[in-house]
């Protein structure tokens, strides 16, 4: 059988069309120099800022500097695996992390890879780590509370869903303890079936010791709080690039809950080390330094991160993302560059003082200079009823206390006010990892403000509170239930509470 030339050509064309090895064009560059986690690359003319590039060894890099004849990229991993002369190819992608409920209960690195030895994460959804913050129209004002379980905070510096409240203080003053207590306190809401009460938590460890992160994870597991928590870890031993991107990755994980009508709480521990990591990257990329050697855009570094926390409008599903950034100060200096930046970005701050901490006032919250600019709108009515006067009374007490150091003879009214102030300070003290339900906090603060503690010796206030709460849980549960359900203290409940407390104080003082 003879084939005509035209038929042969047709057969060849069909066969060629069926071959599955179409060539792909890849844009490739070369590493000119590498060191300190930074690679300088020549030849990637069309690469974009923020794009991911892949080195010969499989390690990924993030392009941050675009220069005339080269590109500066930070290496997200071990820079020993990158050699001078290695080929680098464009991926034409920006950084993405896995998101969704599959991450709950897991410990992941800054890129969303599991590091807890519990296998792969079955997440099908991915999200860019840098997302635009919601606009003004998409938001609504803060109106629902985030209960931290800490009396001093829930009564005096309340936090609302969608708020950004800074926790600031020197090292070893209990900043992380407040954050961990807040996570543990959400367990009660997660035991209920109502989805709108639940707050999912994300804890981001930036530049911390591995032992500290392991300790926190262990504490959360023991408290049964890991079921609704994601831990993102970029420890001190990891590349500065990973410490720099960790908060953005975690924020994207939190935005999944916010944008799907759920509620999330994210803790950045801490943004001082985040700024230091970014300063290191910027200086190595030879960007011009500014104040304290930080680059000029260090304000934008944190503002674009914290602006992503929001309470969404009804049209957008009414979800929320609440942020608790932590800043470590040096010798109580809140006027340094990074602390002032973050104070101006956030909606209030909880200031912890080492002096109070060493005096035994724990949590060591300085009530005088701590504020919550939007949280009071979210505070429940019952708490407003009992805690309205506490801040003023404590301020007056601090003033009188410092004044009384100079004079020994005080008139009875001043002495009574100082004694009352001391008991208020005592009732606001709280053990670590023991958050209180809000209805029990209300009863405790009611006892303090209504002067039921005046006859109780100062050193026995803690014992009084413990016994009183145990008694009320066992025999007067209806009082707690009423406060919890009504969210205010009704006249009937107040009468019951007064009668109970009068009897209890008599019995206790005997």
From Swiss-Prot:
One GO term describing the cellular component: plasma membrane
Binding site for ATP: 169-176
Signal sequence region: none
Record site: Required for activity: 370
Claim: NAD is one of the keywords in the record: no
Catalysed reaction, written as an equation: ATP + H2O + 4 H(+)(in) = ADP + phosphate + 5 H(+)(out)
Oligomer status and interactors: F-type ATPases have 2 components, CF(1) - the catalytic core - and CF(0) - the membrane proton channel. CF(1) has five subunits: alpha(3), beta(3), gamma(1), delta(1), epsilon(1). CF(0) has three main subunits: a(1), b(2) and c(9-12). The alpha and beta chains form an alternating ring which encloses part of the gamma chain. CF(1) is attached to CF(0) by a central stalk formed by the gamma and epsilon chains, while a peripheral stalk is formed by the delta and b chains.
Name recorded for this polypeptide: ATP synthase subunit alpha
Source organism: Rickettsia felis (strain ATCC VR-1525 / URRWXCal2)
Name of the gene encoding the protein in the UniProt record: atpA
């Amino acid at each position: 059988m003879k084939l005509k030339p035209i038929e042969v050509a047709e057969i060849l064309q069909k066969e060629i069309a069926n071959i599955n090895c179409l060539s792909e064009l890849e844009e490739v560059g070369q590493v000119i120099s590498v060191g300190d986690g930074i690679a300088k690359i020549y030849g990637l003319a069309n690469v974009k800022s923020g794009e991911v590039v892949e080195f010969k060894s499989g390690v990924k890099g993030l392009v941050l500097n675009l220069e005339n004849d080269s590109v500066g990229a930070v290496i997200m991993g071990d820079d020993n695996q990158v050699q001078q002369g290695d080929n680098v190819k464009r991926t034409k992608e920006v950084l993405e992390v896995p998101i969704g409920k599959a991450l709950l209960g897991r410990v992941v690195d800054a890129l969303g890879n599991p590091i807890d030895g519990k296998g792969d994460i079955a997440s099908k959804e991915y999200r860019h780590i840098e997302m635009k913050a919601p606009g003004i129209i998409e938001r609504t004002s803060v109106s629902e509370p985030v209960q931290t379980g800490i009396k001093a905070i829930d009564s005096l510096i309340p936090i609302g869903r969608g708020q950004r409240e800074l926790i600031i203080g020197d090292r070893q003053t209990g900043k992380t303890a407040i954050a961990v207590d807040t996570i543990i306190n959400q367990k009660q809401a997660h035991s209920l079936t109502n989805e709108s009460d639940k707050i999912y938590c994300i804890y981001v460890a930036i530049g911390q010791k591995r032992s500290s992160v392991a300790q926190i994870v262990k504490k959360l597991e023991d408290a049964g709080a890991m079921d609704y928590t994601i831990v993102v870890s970029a420890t001190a031993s990891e590349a500065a690039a990973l410490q720099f991107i960790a908060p953005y990755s975690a924020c994207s994980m939190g935005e999944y809950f916010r944008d799907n009508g759920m509620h999330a709480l994210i803790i950045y521990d801490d943004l001082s080390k985040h700024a230091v990591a970014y300063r290191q990257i910027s200086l190595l990329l030879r960007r011009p330094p500014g104040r304290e050697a930080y680059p000029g855009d260090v304000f934008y570094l944190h503002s674009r991160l914290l602006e992503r926390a929001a309470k969404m409008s009804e049209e957008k599903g009414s979800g929320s993302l609440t942020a608790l950034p932590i800043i470590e100060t040096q010798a109580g200096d809140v006027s340094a560059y990074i602390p002032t930046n973050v104070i101006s970005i956030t909606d209030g701050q909880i200031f912890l003082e080492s002096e109070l901490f060493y005096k035994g006032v724990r949590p060591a919250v300085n009530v005088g200079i701590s504020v919550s600019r939007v949280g009071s709108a979210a505070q429940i009515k019952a708490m407003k009823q009992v805690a309205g006067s506490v801040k003023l009374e404590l301020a007056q007490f601090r003033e009188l206390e410092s004044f009384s150091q100079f004079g020994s003879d005080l008139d009875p009214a001043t002495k009574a006010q100082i004694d009352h102030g001391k008991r208020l300070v005592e009732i606001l003290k709280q053990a670590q990892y023991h958050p209180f339900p809000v209805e029990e906090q209300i009863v405790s603060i009611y006892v303090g403000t209504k002067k039921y503690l005046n006859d109780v010796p100062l050193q026995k206030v803690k014992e009084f509170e413990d016994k009183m709460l145990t008694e009320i849980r066992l025999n007067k549960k209806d009082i707690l239930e009423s406060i919890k359900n009504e969210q205010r203290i009704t006249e009937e409940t107040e009468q019951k509470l007064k009668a109970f407390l009068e009897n209890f104080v008599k019995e206790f003082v005997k």
